[in-house]
Amino acid sequence: MTTIISVRRNGHVVIGGDGQATIGNTIMKGNVRKVRRLYYNDKVIAGFAGGTADAFTLFELFERKLESYQGHLVKAAVELAKDWRTDRRLRRLEALLAVADENASLIITGNGDVIQPEKDLIAIGSGGPYAQSAARALLENTNFSAREIVKKSLVIAGDICIYTNQFHTIEELTSTAEGY
């Protein structure tokens, strides 16, 4: 359980996440880095919601796909989703990935889904609905930067969701896509 949010605005794409890891109802760690840069020269940012070990496995597999497809985000995401859905070992992994590069923002699921959400706003995890609501309100009613919106959305989600804390990892790329 966690909160991962991605916002694209004014030539920037930002993904942020909290750092809480839980087992059942117990907080096991409060400073997990659920958002990281991937691929050559850190051209892709990715965040995960779900099992930590599963997510690190998926990060590694996704980075290999990015290398195989020369950094083409959509192709790498589709190929990862195919493998995730069809490979018996991978099917057991429970996580969602939010990934972005300068052109696209995607959600990758274990069901084989690769989704480019409307207006490139992604929110996943237990605190996702709270962060998404906050981000939409801020996008529609303020001139805040993508980074400010991600930060404020994570704070709001952390105040509401018991599986989200206030330790944040935030990564940013310059973007060519418009988003909100």
UniProtKB/Swiss-Prot annotation:
Any single GO BP term: proteolysis involved in protein catabolic process
Active-site residues, record numbering mapped to chain: T2
Residues engaged in binding Na(+): G158, C161, T164
Regulation: Allosterically activated by HslU binding.
EC number of the protein: 3.4.25.2
Subunit structure, as described in the record: A double ring-shaped homohexamer of HslV is capped on each side by a ring-shaped HslU homohexamer. The assembly of the HslU/HslV complex is dependent on binding of ATP.
Protein name: ATP-dependent protease subunit HslV
Species for this entry: Baumannia cicadellinicola subsp. Homalodisca coagulata
Gene name per UniProt: hslV
